[in-house]
């Protein structure tokens, strides 16, 4: 097999360098910011912090597409309900796994909010705040992504789609 790698930067790969502008530094992973609408907590926080001076460009109805060698293509819609329907259309026999995946995402997201809240508490409160706020998240954080995804479905293509965007997070799902 041959693989073509298209890379314009002098250092190939992601997470290999940072940008610096006007005293600020960030890694290349921040090329898109999601959930910045007025209907989401991150969007409301950023709107408040910037006093409404930032205008966010939409990533579009589908912010990503994946193409497979056998002509299978899947789009990643911006809205979770549309993504669920996209997955159900592509994998009609996997409704249980798809619903379990979305339920898991909701639960992990909710537990991470509590986890981060526990991280901003004074250190002397950690024994209490960790047990009250961080416990569920810690359970998720101690699991390998690949193990969790494999527990949802044996369909390898669906497993790949569930973890397709691992590159955004800088670590392999295993």
Map each language-model feature to its residues:
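N-terminal glycine-rich phosphate/pyrophosphate-binding loop and immediately adjacent elements
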Residues: 1-110
């Amino acid at each position: 097999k041959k693989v073509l790698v298209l890379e314009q930067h002098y250092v190939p790969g992601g997470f290999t360098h940072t940008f610096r502008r006007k005293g600020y530094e960030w890694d290349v992973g921040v090329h898109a910011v999601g959930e910045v609408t007025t209907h989401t907590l991150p969007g409301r926080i950023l709107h408040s912090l910037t006093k409404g001076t930032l205008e966010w460009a939409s990533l579009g109805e589908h912010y990503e597409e994946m193409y497979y060698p056998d002509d299978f293509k899947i789009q990643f819609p911006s809205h979770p309900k549309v993504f669920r329907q996209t997955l159900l259309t592509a994998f009609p026999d996997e409704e249980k796994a798809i619903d379990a995946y979305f339920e898991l995402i909701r639960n992990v997201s909710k537990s991470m909010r509590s986890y981060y809240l526990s991280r901003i508490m004074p250190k002397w409160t950690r024994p209490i705040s960790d047990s009250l706020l961080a416990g569920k998240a810690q359970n998720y954080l101690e699991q390998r992504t690949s193990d969790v995804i494999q527990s949802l479905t044996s369909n390898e293509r669906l497993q790949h789609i569930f973890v397709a965007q691992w590159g955004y997070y800088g670590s392999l799902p295993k």
